Amino acid sequence: MDFKEYRQRGKEMVDYIADYLENIRERRVFPDVSPGYMRQLLPESAPIEGEPWPKIFSDVERIVMPGITHWQSPHMHAYFPALNSMPSLLGDMLADAINCLGFTWASSPACTELEIIVMNWLGKMIGLPDAFLHLSSQSQGGGVLQTTASEATLVCLLAGRTRAIQRFHERHPGYQDAEINARLVAYCSDQAHSSVEKAALIGLVRMRYIEADDDLAMRGKLLREAIEDDIKQGLVPFWVCATLGTTGSCSFDNLEEIGIVCAEHHLWLHVDAAYAGSAFICPEFRTWLRGIERADSIAFNPSKWLMVHFDATALWVRDSTAVHRTFNVEPLYLQHENSGVAVDFMHWQIPLSRRFRALKVWFVLRSYGIKGLQRHIREGVRLAQKFEALVLADHRFELPAKRHLGLVVFRIRGDNEITEKLLKRLNHRGNLHCIPSSLKGQYVIRFTITSTHTTLDDIVKDWMEIRQVASTVLEEMNITISNRVYLKETKEKNEAFGSSLLLSNSPLSPKVVNGSFAAIFDADEFLAKTYAGVRIAHQESPSMRRRVRGILMSGKQFSLDSHMDVVVQTTLDAGNGATRTSTTNSYGHTTSAAQANSERQASIQEDNEESPEETELLSLCRTSNVPSPEHAHSLSTPSRSCSSSSHSLIHSLTQSSPRSSPVNQFRPITLCAVPSQSQLSMPLAMPLPNRNVTVSVDSLLNPVTTCNVYHGKRFLEPLENLAQTSASFSSSIFRLPTPIATPTRESPEDPDWPAKTFSQLLLERYSSQSQSLGNNSSTESSSLSGGATPTPTPMSSLDELVTPLLLSFASPSQPMLSAHGIGEGQREQGSDSDATVCSTTSSMESL
């Protein structure tokens, strides 16, 4: 092939590559071939004479592509990303054409010089201390591009071994290196990558694995205990590997604690951030990097997530002389006149020759810039969050580990066999590709955002495939995953979890429950929209709306989980006021399909039946003097008296839907509650002082529903944000005040919070604005303001009392309700939030 033909074939190859990447979504992700398939397609010996290029290239599609696992496919979710980009491909095209071997500065000065600059750029981008950078010719630290993170780990372990042997000789002269090496011990988490174990095998040193905590992280305490125990046995601890972003679950070792322990015992601390290191270019993810100042080395792979194709691993060391001592060999033919002054990277690695990798990294950094790469990282995290929400919305699945960055691990509840069968079936179908992992004995599926082409539509499509195959597998195995859970079991999993998840109070039920709880019923279909968004194409019966309506109209008190599934139910005995409590099937317990179907049909029938309470309530709705459907609101009967120690009352506020028939006007959707003041160290109005908000979460603090009561608008807010803004936000289920339980004084430390209910504020406002209110109403309002228990008010009179007030509160032209009645300042501050509300709501609906 001459230059003329090369130009032609080169253009054809560029077109082929562009077409391949542009249309990769159409290809099957995982190949449908068997081992040895290619032997039948190719001859046993190489051709004697050369073949024309068209014939060679035609065999790419015929022979090679059928056996390719398409790592750039948006439906590829196995392993960690192995991304590429056009600037990266162009960089290696040029580097391969130049084909220089930059083992010394003299062998190719530009190769070495550009690598030094690129490594400084990358180090500054992820926030490394200056001690790790090439800042001057006298600088001891610096960075180098290695082939893989495995090689980087081995280099650092061997360097740490050399330093440890030298120090041992200084303290105890007379020992042979082999004798000292036999005593050396290295440490890592039991979640560390297999390359750490392989490095220890090559280095002929012992590797001790530290058990990870419940968050799958290695902590300083257990590491210190292991080190001290080994010292007592005459061993020599010398090296620790901390992992930031484990392969199994993307968990993070506590680098700060580990660094302190390593400093105490003078151990080499290596940080393996192969995947997560790319995310550190975003400042919000650098919290995991705290303690890096105590590390001796750190490595991550730009070839994983920074749009640079394989191979490219960035390694920084604090003391390059320790690496030089380990790999320093200088035969005469490798020496040059600048030896000792210029950087010779052959002393920083195991092989001698090295590729011009810095060129493609340089092309990518200049083409995308820091902001462009940050957008890419954040988009991957956003898509992983979307997938996490989809998994959480299906009760058959669970997340055995917290999601970090772009990796989600999930499994079907129950035996490992079910999840294993699901994964095998998914990979056999070939429409998406995932791999398994084992987390503390649980078989899990890893789902990683691995492609620059992945969109939300791809994520939804893959999730629908997973759900469909899961349904088939469960049906074949005659297994039904129960979505009900013993409250006792929930409390055992979380000691801080209270005695109830969520209290649902029927508007007509006079029963007494814990006075610290309140229920808000919202008929604006907010939760229905949210629920539909995260449970795409949800087809299970009974429907969410029917189930919640049936619960509320049944006259029973229920505890519910975050998916509105029954946990414990308490039924009032109308005869003597006693309660009866019954529990349901155990969490994750499997039942036969026939039994589950029978229970489901019974639940549907119960929900469809119109109870006497519902009939009476609908009758009141039709006969009461309620305004037009566009503005209709009503307030239910308050519950009977609670204990005097509680200053909050239970009320049910029902807002009718402006577009619904009378039957649906009392369709409660959002349920919220407030903890008693004994559970609070401070009022939790503090995080959002100018908003009336409610939060609904599950016992594991998974994603929540946050409602902002500004003119009927709603928005979502992550639980993490709330937890970070309030020190008293813990694992309690409802930790923010609702409009019907608000502070009564200016002081945020008011010990009597919450003291007033929504109806109390309504009555106070009515008293101040209406001269027509009789003495009885004034007396009742005064009694309520003092925190005393109100006399039960008949539905008709209460409806006549509050309807005009509800209409005025709902009107955008009216001031917002505050803890002291009406506050103009709150309404003005609330207007700024409205924009956020609209924006967030639109984003939520787009899901």
Swiss-Prot record:
Bias (Low complexity): 634-657, 769-787
Composition bias type Acidic residues, residue spans: 606-616
Class in the EC hierarchy, top level: lyase
GO molecular function annotations of the record: histidine decarboxylase activity; pyridoxal phosphate binding
Catalytic activity line of the entry: L-histidine + H(+) = histamine + CO2
UniProt keyword Cell cycle present: no
Sequence positions bearing N6-(pyridoxal phosphate)lysine: 304
SUPFAM superfamilies found in the cross-reference section: PLP-dependent transferases
Signal peptide: none
Cofactors named for this entry: pyridoxal 5'-phosphate
Entry superkingdom: Eukaryota
A Pfam cross-reference name: Pyridoxal_deC
Region (Disordered): 575-662, 769-798, 813-847
Keywords recorded for this protein, A-Z: Catecholamine biosynthesis, Decarboxylase, Lyase, Pyridoxal phosphate
Compositionally biased tracts (Polar residues): 575-605, 832-847
PANTHER family assigned: GROUP II PYRIDOXAL-5-PHOSPHATE DECARBOXYLASE (PTHR11999), HISTIDINE DECARBOXYLASE (PTHR11999:SF68)
Role description: Required in photoreceptor transmitter synthesis. Catlayzes the conversion of L-histidine to histamine.
Stated family: Belongs to the group II decarboxylase family.
Protein name per UniProt: Histidine decarboxylase
Organism, as annotated: Drosophila melanogaster
Gene: Hdc
